């Protein structure tokens, strides 16, 4: 899939829509943040198509995520919020009182152990995880755990874990939670649907709970979150927020979400009620920062979900502004965690700017060595794609439960193509809906809800839905238009076969997709899938390195680029400079002179000889001194790390 849909997402996020929030105000010129004033407007809105779909009215009675009535605690708090008493971590005597009136995210049954909505709670097939390979690299990696009880997460959080019906940790949770609980920075590469959200939410919530007496500035206009979680899309931000609210229930930790496409004043009012964890999209967070409504100076935890997409598809300037140019504490002072299903080497190099002495964790893909996701590739000319899709849907309906259509996700390249295909499907008796960048936030939320409930069991989507969204029970993913990048293909088919359950992925291939032939054939071979002979012939004709095949790491979505960098050493194997290492001088590191990452010979990561990570001298030669990343000078990557494989 081309990058158009992600640009569309960004543009759509910048154009707030006021409908459905029960909020109106006198007409006036909209505030446009300075960093967006030079942008060109988004493409014209595509008129909604008729048919049997979700595009009726929107019951906009809700006041947004977080809901009313979630008062932030007793009087006398330091937030000075408008419209009533607030509380929080500034005033411990009042902040915890909000637990008495906190909305129950598990339901309204009032039981000590409320049940999670069964439709949303996908049953995890833990047996499928038993043989998944795991790789860790870095200094002094904490050992994995086998149960949540092995880590002191706190009584209230442990109770919520039980309420969520989490029996035991998934592989990414077994390894990531102890790493983060130890205060280490982390870059984690794990398949979507493998439990990444809980893997970073649990340590964040636990860390805030354990430091209950932190004082934040009083009587100021802005708010001071202790944790920031960034995601590339509104849907993923809302999903993370909903999950984090479940995990933080009755802990005293307040979670708020902020994203574009909705009135900013509604979200400002929610922030003024208090916030400990802020889940946000980069564009809306930059807007709030420029308005002076949010300060990052108290941030102790920074998490980036789908980090590779944010850094690779145009969000990098916004991320760098948030992390490096505002008042956020530097790496080493704050704890940073990056998660995604894929981490190509070039994205790792960008991401490493935000981390300090980090650990790299790679969890093998579920389905790479099993048949959990059955992948099929069929040669279909563009003119025949619709009729071929119709044949698939008819066969799927006949084989379905009591004639019901199984949930099917169809990926297309353009927004207009999505609307056109949706209209055609509805006309031909297949209820469908769409999600793409030109639909308002309300329409996108309604479309997702309609799809999840089975009212419209076919969702036609651009790549806006490909990243991170947890849509349970998707039986079939159809790549109507193949993407141009194999990593995007991996994220797309990851919408099915989630949580260790089985699924089907079908791709339509033709002469327009020849650059994908080689990486697609390699991926299918890796996953023990049957590769058609005609695809093998296309792959053999493909030139070496053709297309945008950025994958590395075999069964993993990526491997630690530092291993390759430091193991190659020199002799023309460098990346930036000739004759060794990453520098432009023989034997050099990342810097301009011999011996390390810094600009001084023998320099480690900092700018002091034998130095550390940045000007703080962190490491002092023990970690980043002469010779590489090892714990002993001149020893390369250092001693072997104990295996974390199951």
Curated annotation (Swiss-Prot):
SMART domains linked to this entry: DEXDc, HELICc
Motif annotated as Q motif, chain positions: 146-174
Pfam families, per the entry: DEAD, Helicase_C
Positions of the Helicase C-terminal domain: 388-539
EC code: 3.6.4.13
UniProt xrefs under Gene3D superfamilies: P-loop containing nucleotide triphosphate hydrolases
Single annotated GO MF: ATP binding
Residue stretches making up the Helicase ATP-binding domain: 177-361
Alphabetical list of PROSITE patterns matching this protein: HELICASE_ATP_BIND_1, HELICASE_CTER, Q_MOTIF
Domain of life, source organism: Eukaryota
Enzyme class: hydrolase
Region (Disordered), start-end ranges: 1-64, 76-117
UniProtKB keywords: Acetylation, ATP-binding, Helicase, Hydrolase, Nucleotide-binding, RNA-binding
PANTHER family, A to Z: ATP-DEPENDENT RNA HELICASE DBP3
Recorded family membership: Belongs to the DEAD box helicase family. DDX3/DED1 subfamily.
Entry protein name: DEAD-box ATP-dependent RNA helicase 52
Encoding gene (name): RH52
């Amino acid at each position: 899939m081309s990058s158009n849909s992600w640009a569309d997402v960004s543009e759509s996020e910048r154009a707030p829509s006021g409908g459905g929030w029960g909020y109106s105000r006198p007409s006036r010129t909209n505030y446009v943040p300075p960093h967006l004033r030079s942008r060109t407007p988004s493409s014209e809105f595509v008129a909604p198509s008729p048919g049997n779909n979700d595009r009726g009215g929107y019951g906009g009675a809700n006041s947004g995520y977080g809901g009313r009535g979630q008062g932030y605690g007793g009087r006398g708090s330091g937030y000075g919020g408008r419209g009533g008493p607030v509380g929080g971590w500034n005033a411990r005597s009042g902040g915890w009182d909000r637990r008495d009136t906190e909305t129950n995210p598990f339901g309204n049954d009032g039981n000590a152990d409320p049940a999670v909505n069964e439709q949303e709670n996908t049953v995890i097939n833990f047996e499928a995880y038993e043989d998944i390979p795991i790789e860790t690299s870095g200094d002094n990696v904490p050992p994995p755990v086998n149960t949540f009880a092995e880590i002191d997460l706190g009584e209230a959080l442990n109770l919520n874990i039980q309420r969520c019906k989490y029996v035991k940790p998934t592989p990414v949770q077994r390894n990531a939670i102890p790493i983060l609980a130890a205060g280490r920075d982390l870059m984690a590469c794990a398949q979507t649907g493998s439990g990444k959200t809980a893997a970073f939410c649990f340590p964040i919530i636990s860390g805030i709970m354990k430091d209950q007496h932190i004082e934040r500035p009083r009587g100021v206009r802005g708010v001071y979150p202790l944790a920031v979680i960034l995601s590339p899309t509104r849907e993923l931000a809302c999903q993370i927020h909903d999950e984090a609210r479940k995990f933080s229930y009755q802990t005293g930790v307040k979670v708020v979400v902020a994203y574009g496409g909705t009135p900013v004043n509604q979200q400002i009012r929610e922030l003024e009620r208090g916030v400990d964890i802020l889940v946000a999209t980069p564009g809306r967070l930059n807007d709030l920062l420029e308005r002076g409504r949010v300060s990052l100076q108290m941030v102790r935890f920074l998490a980036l979900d789908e980090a590779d997409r944010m850094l690779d598809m145009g969000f990098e300037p916004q991320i760098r502004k948030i992390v490096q140019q505002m008042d956020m504490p530097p790496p080493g002072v704050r704890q940073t965690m990056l998660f995604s299903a894929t981490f190509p080497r070039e994205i790792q190099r960008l991401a490493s700017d935000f981390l300090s002495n980090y650990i790299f964790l790679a969890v093998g893909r579920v389905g790479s060595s099993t048949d959990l996701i059955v992948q099929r590739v069929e040669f279909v000319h563009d003119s025949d794609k619709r009729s071929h899709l119709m044949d698939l849907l008819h066969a799927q309906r006949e084989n379905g439960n009591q004639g019901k259509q199984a949930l099917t996700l169809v990926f297309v390249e353009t927004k207009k193509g999505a609307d056109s295909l949706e209209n055609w499907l509805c006309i031909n008796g297949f209820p469908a809906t769409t999600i793409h960048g030109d639909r308002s936030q309300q329409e996108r939320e309604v479309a997702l809800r309609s799809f999840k409930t089975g009212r419209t069991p076919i969702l036609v989507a651009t790549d806006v839905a490909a990243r991170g969204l947890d849509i349970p029970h998707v039986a079939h993913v159809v790549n109507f238009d193949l993407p141009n990048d194999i990593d995007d293909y991996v994220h797309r088919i990851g919408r099915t076969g989630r949580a260790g359950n089985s699924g089907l992925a079908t791709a339509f291939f033709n002469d327009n997709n020849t650059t994908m032939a080689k990486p697609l054939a390699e991926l299918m071979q890796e996953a023990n899938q049957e590769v058609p002979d005609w695809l093998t012939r296309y792959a053999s004709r493909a030139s070496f390195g053709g297309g945008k095949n950025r994958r590395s790491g075999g069964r993993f979505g990526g491997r630690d680029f530092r291993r390759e960098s430091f193991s190659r050493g020199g002799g023309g194997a460098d990346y930036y400079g000739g004759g060794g290492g990453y520098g432009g001088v023989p034997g050099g590191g990342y810097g301009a002179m011999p011996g390390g990452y810094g600009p001084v010979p023998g320099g480690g990561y900092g700018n002091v000889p034998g130095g550390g990570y940045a000007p703080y001298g962190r490491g002092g030669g023990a970690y980043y001194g002469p010779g590489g990343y090892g714990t002993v000078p001149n020893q390369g990557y250092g001693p072997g790390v104990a295996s974390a494989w199951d």
